């Protein structure tokens, strides 16, 4: 077996999966959803949330989504814009929420990016 080729293929596949999970919504699409009433969900810890947040965002930590979100968001068709500190946890949240039957979930990415999008900058 040619190990360098095999390892290269694995790296490409893993990279594709990670990119797919972390792909962020465009600024234009996010702003369109915000104007139409999308909810912004911050999946960071409560401590992180208290240190700075997007105006109007709801804090539901990643580990609490499965239990908390259905109680707080009854309409599964509600557009949800998720973010965290860097975009990694929000990528996981997006996948988890889609698996829970929420089809309209978009990853804003990092806190800084989410703040800029919401502020219109």
Language model regions located:
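Rhodanese-like catalytic fold shared by cysteine-dependent sulfurtransferases
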Residues: 2-29, 33-38, 46-79, 88-121
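Short, surface-exposed ligand- or partner-binding patches at beta-edge/loop junctions that are enriched
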Residues: 82-83
């Amino acid at each position: 077996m040619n190990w360098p080729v095999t390892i290269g293929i694995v790296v490409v596949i893993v990279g594709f999966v990670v990119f797919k999970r972390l792909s962020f919504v465009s600024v234009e699409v996010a702003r369109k959803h915000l104007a139409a009433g999308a909810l912004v969900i911050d999946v960071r810890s409560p401590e992180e949330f208290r240190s700075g947040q997007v105006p109007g965002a709801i804090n539901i930590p990643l580990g609490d989504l499965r239990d908390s979100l259905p109680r707080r968001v009854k309409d599964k068709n509600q557009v949800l814009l998720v973010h965290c500190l860097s975009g990694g946890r929000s990528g996981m949240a997006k996948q988890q929420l889609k698996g829970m039957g929420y089809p309209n979930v978009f990853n804003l990415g990092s806190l800084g990016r989410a703040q800029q999008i919401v502020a219109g900058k």
